[in-house]
Amino acid sequence: MPPRPSLDLLDYVHELNRLFLAFLRSAARERRDCLGLPPRAERALLQASPELLEMLAQFPHALFRLTLDDQATGRVIDPLRGGTDGAHYSLSLMILQSARSLSRQSTYQARLLMGLSSRAMQRLRGMPLSDLPALARKADLVLCAFPERDWLWIELLRESRPEARQQLTLIALQPWLEQEWPRRRFAQLSP
């Protein structure tokens, strides 16, 4: 049986989730790019109570994803501009450094908690610390997790029943499942 994630590492992912949600909420309020969050989920994010946002931050998986395996669009963030770009850059750098550190500590936990691929972890483990600031300037480096499951974001932002939250967690941790299957199964749980 694989080792259970360290609570310290899980707490760290929860902190990163809080920062990511705060960035997304600010971006949604100002009608800026929400890093791939579906428009319906943007509205739900703005309407979510602080308690629900905290519950979402406690999700046992990163709510963001690093796109190290994907081709970059070429758009870069200018951290010296401050404001939005500065906040986006800081968030990206923090997540990137955390992913690098986690992938060096435990590939199992990096895959489980952050959804990092083997290729991404190899790249991060071999990357000098001095390369991180330049990589963090790529605007599409950090995006919302579960991009193909917009319905999952809606449910995560609305559902507070423990049994439904548990099922959402299981769905999110099994990205290889048929994408429509979980939606049908989740609908059976709804009142």
Task: Give the residues covered by each predicted segment.
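Extended, low-complexity, amphipathic alpha-helical coiled-coil/linker regions that act as scaffolds
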Residues: P2-L10, A120-M127, D131-E159
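Aromatic/pi-system hotspot detector in well-structured domains
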Residues: F20, L52, L56, S92, ...
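Membrane-interacting alpha-helical segments
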Residues: P5-H14, I77-M94, L143-W153
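Long, low-complexity acidic/proline-rich regions
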Residues: E180-P191
